[in-house]
Design a protein with these regions (language model features):
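Acidic, Ala/Val/Gly-enriched low-complexity intrinsically disordered segments
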Residues: 1-3, 19-20
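Short glycine-rich loop/turn motifs that provide flexible caps or phosphate-binding loops at active sites
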Residues: 15, 31, 95-98
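Cationic, low-complexity basic patches in intrinsically disordered or flexible, solvent-exposed regions
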Residues: 6-9
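Intrinsic disorder/low-complexity detector
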Residues: 19-22, 121
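Aromatic (phenylalanine/tyrosine) cluster motif
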Residues: 11-14, 21
Length: 207
């Protein structure tokens, strides 16, 4: 009796300079935000893949509160930004980025951030980052109704935190800024396109 077995796909190493890889990657990508930090983070990641990729930024609604609460709500905001950007442009894929906060069982609070990538075939990728404990004084202001960025502006006596170094830049004393924290999660969300053989259903052969 013939037995079926799954064929393992052939994998290749991505060096960032593969002509074969570039021929199947996107040439036009949209990002669902005009926030300069978000746009710069996407641009930096795409430049490591293919400098010639066209990036279009569009202002879209996230469909969630200005201060998302919890990973699920933050993910939903990122997804809805990506979907709206795809609908509003002629891009082949779109990226949505959303930052939020998570209330933990012990009453403390942490930050979170998510990236969602969608393309016109319906494929989706998601990546998360920025799980960082928030000081009690920051958490208290968020519980009172402030956004994280506005709370940081008030406490650090600055302006435009979320359009610059971000809360993470202040709370890590500049060790990493918001753009630097966003770049890894964008890379994670692109994994299904960067290494598609790992994500496609394996072929089945029969002896």
């Amino acid at each position: 009796v013939a037995a079926s077995k799954r064929l393992q796909p052939t994998f290749s190493r991505f060096s960032g300079h593969s002509a074969d890889f570039m021929s199947v990657f996107f040439t036009h990508v949209a990002v669902g935000s005009r926030n300069p930090v978000k746009v710069a983070a996407v641009r930096a990641v795409l430049a490591r893949i293919q400098p010639a990729i066209r990036l279009e930024s569009v202002e879209v609604a996230s469909g969630v509160p200005d201060q998302p609460m919890g990973d699920a709500e933050t993910q939903r905001g990122a997804r809805q930004r990506a979907q709206a950007a795809l609908q509003q442009t002629g891009a082949e894929c779109a990226i949505g980025l959303e930052g939020g906060v998570v209330l933990l069982p012990d009453g403390s609070m942490r930050s979170c951030a998510w990236a969602v990538v969608v393309d016109r075939s319906g494929r989706e990728g998601m990546g998360g980052s920025l799980s960082m404990p928030l000081p009690d004084m920051v958490a208290a202001r968020i519980r009172a109704g402030e956004e994280l960025g506005h709370a940081m502006d008030a406490l650090a006596q600055t302006v435009g935190t979320k359009h610059g170094r971000g809360a993470v830049g202040i709370l890590t004393a500049g060790l990493i800024d918001r753009q630097g924290a966003y770049e890894p999660m964008i890379s994670y969300a692109l994994a299904p396109w960067l290494a598609p053989a790992w994500y496609e259903p394996p072929a089945v052969a029969r002896d």
